Amino acid sequence: PPPHPKHSFPTRRSSDLDWVAVGENRVAITFTPADQSLNRRDEFLYTLLVPDRARTVFPCFDQPDMKSFFTLTLEVPSTWQAVANGAITQTDSTSVSGRNRISFKETEPLSTYLFSFVAGKLTREVYSRNGRDISIYHRETDPKKIAQCPAIADEVFDALEWQEDFTGIPYPFAKYDVIILPGFQYGGMEHTGATLYTDRRMFLDEHPTLNERLSRSSLIAHETSHMWFGDYVTMKWFDDVWTKEVFANYFASRIVEPLYPDVNHRLNFIRDYIPASYSEDRTSGANPIKQDLDNLRNAGLVYGNIIYDKSPVIMEMLVRVLGEDAFQQGIREYLTTYAYGNATWEGLIRILNKYTEEDLAAWSEVWVNQKGMPEITASVKDGELVVEQRDPLGRGLKWPQELTYRVICGTDSEEIPVSLEGNSDSFRMKLSFLPNGNCVILPNINGRGYGFFKITEGESSGLWSVLRSSEDEVLKGSLLITLYENLRWKTISPQGFREEMLAYLPNESNSLLFSMALSYLGDCQRIFPSDSRPLEQVLWKIVTTNPVSQHRLQAFRLYRSIADSEEAVQRLYTLWQERKAPKDCTLSESDYIGLSYMLAMHLPEKADKIIATQLSRIQNPDRKKEYQFISPSVSPRKEERDSVFASLLIAGNRRVEPWASSALAHLNHRLREQESVAYIRPALEAMPEVQRTGDIFFPTAWVRSLLSAHTSKEARKEVDAFFTAHPDFPLMLSNKIKQQASHLY
C-alpha cells in the first residue's frame, strides 16, 4: 500500500484527539530490540518469533489476526549475508568501514510471528526451475553435505508445484529462500521468503537410512505446505494453531508419495503419526486437539504430538467422510475465502459441511474438542464378532469411526467392516462360518482406526503368530502398534514382548517395519530394564550379518544405546578407537560423537582422553562448539556434572536449546540414574522459567531429557512430591510433565 501520511504530533497533549488525524495515521517509534529472540551466535543470528516473541524485537500488537506489511533495513558487517521475508532491493556501504546497509522489499500481509531475518557468515547457492529461483543459505563445510543442496532444492520445487496444483492457487508470496542453520531449535519454521531449517535433518550423512530420507522430504513438504496453510491463511488465535499443523503434516504425507514409489505410503502414514500421537494421548497429561488458550504467552504450550500427529489421522478420517473431490473443493473455497487473512476451525467446518450430509460439527466435537481415545475390545460370542468401545475417562463419549477386523478360526478367515456410530457403544456381526475352538481376532488391520485396541496376554500369541507369518505390511505395522500399546497399558508382559520381538526382528526385511520394531524393542528395554545381553547378541548379529546395510546401521545405534556388558562396551571402545566400523555399517561423524559420549560414561577412567580425542577429530567449527558445550555432561566427576546442571538452570546457558537438551539428557542417563534423581525437583521447579525464556518445543524437550531415562521408584516419588508441593501448577505445564513421566507409573 502507499505510505501513510505522516501526522505531526503536538508537544503537549491536551486530549486524546490531539494525537490522531482524520483518516490514516502513522506512528513512528525508535526502539532497541531485546536479545531474547535474536538467537545471536559468534558468526550469525536469526529471529524466531513464533508464537509471541515479535514483541521482544519491535513494538507491536503481537497476535496472529493482526497482519501487516513489513519493510526492513539491516546494517551488518560487509562479510555477512542477510536474508529476510522480502527480496533485497539495495545494498549500500555505510560511513563505518566494513559495514553494509541492506534494504528489503515490502512483504505481503504477514502475522507478526512470521516476520524473519537471518544475517551472518553464510554460503549461498541458487537453483532455478521453470522461471522460479530458490536460494539456499548454509554454514556447512563438508563437501559431501553441501552436494545435497540440489536435491533439497528439487524437493522444494516439487512441493511448491504439488500445492499449486492441489489448491489451484499459485505460490502466494514473492520468493522462497531456505536457510539451513546449525543448532536451530525446530525441524523447520515456515517464514515466508526465509524458511529456516535445522542442519541435523537437512544435511544427511553419507549413507542415510530410509527413515532419514523420508524425514527430510516430509519436513520440506511440511514447511512448504505452510505457505498456503498458516501463512496465506492463518489461524485467528493460537488455540487453532493445529489448523495449520494438521494441513502441513497431512499434505506432507501426500507430497512425498511420488518421490518414493517403492515405499508403502499407507504404512508410512501409520508409522509416522499414530505411535507419536498415542505417546501423549495415552497419558494422564493428554489434551484435546483444540485447547483453550487464555493468554498468548502460553501459546507455546499448545504445541505437541496431539496437534502434530493425532490431527492428520483425524484429517484422514474427515477426507474419507467427505470424499477426495469434495475435500479438494472445500479446501479451495477455504483458501479463497480467507486469502491473506485469518480463519477458524469452525469456519472451515462450515465450508466443508456444504459438501456432505454428515454432521461434521458433531463429529468434530468428539475428535477435536475432547481429549483421549476410546478403549476398544473385541470377542467372538455365539458365532458373532462383537466389538465394543468405552470411554476410559468415564465421560460416556462415543467416537464414530470405521474399522476393519479379521477373524481367523483354524482354516477359516473373514474380514469384517466395523462401524462404530456416534450413538452406540458396540457393533455385532454374524460370522460367515461357524467358529470352532479359539479364534484369533486381528483389530484395525488397515491401521485406519484410532484408539487403544485392548487384548490379553493370551490373545497376544495369535497376533505375534500372524506378525511373523503375514506378508501384509500394513497389517504388520498395525499389529506392532497394537502390541506395543498393550505393553504400555500393561495388559501384556515386558518379558513376553521382548522375547517375541527378538524372534521377529532379525527376519523383517521391510525397512519401515524394521525401524518400528527396533524402536519398540529399545523402548521396552528403556522402560522395563532387564539383562541386556540377549538383546546385545541379537543386535550384534544383525549389525554383522543382515543383508540390508541400513538395518545394520540402525541396529548398531540401538546396540550402542543399550550396551552394558563388558564385552559389548569393550567392542565399542575398540571400534571407536580404531574408527573401524563393521562391514556394510558405515558410521558417520555424528555416530562416533554419540559413541564417545556413551564410552565416557561407561569407562570413567578413560573419559577425559576419549573426549579430548573426539574433539580433535571434529573439524567443523559449529560442531566443535556443540561438542565442547555437551561433553562436560558426561564427565566422570560428579562435581563437574553438578556444575553443568546448575549452569542449565540459568537461561543464558540454554540459548542453543538442542545443545541444552542433549546435555540434560546425558546428565540423566540411565548409568547416572541414582545420582541424577537429585536433579528432578529443581529441573521441574524451573519449568515456568524454561517456558518463559525458551521456544515452543523446549519445555517438552527439557522434561523429556530430564525424565526419559529414569525408571526408579525414587524418580516417581520426586515427581509426586513436586505435584504435591504445587497443587495449582499451571495446567498446560503440568500436562507436559505428565506426558513425559507416564512411564514411571
Label each PLM-derived region with a short phrase.
Residues 12, 176, 441-443:
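Generic beta-strand hydrophobic packing signal
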Residues 1-3, 7-14:
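Short, small-residue-biased leader/transition segments that mark boundaries at the very start
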Residues 2-4, 167-169, 185, 430-431:
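Short, flexible, glycine/charge-rich loop motifs used to bind or transfer phosphoryl groups or to couple energy/partner
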Residues 104, 136-398, 533-538, 549-550, ...:
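Hydrophobic alpha-helical and helix-loop surface patches within well-folded domains
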Residues 7-9, 97, 131, 190, ...:
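Short, solvent-exposed coil/turn segments
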Residues 48, 127-133, 195-196, 282-288, ...:
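Short alpha-helical hairpin
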Residues 12-174, 200, 303-307, 320-325, ...:
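Acidic/His-enriched low-complexity segments
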Residues 48, 73-76, 81, 140, ...:
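Non-catalytic accessory/interaction domains
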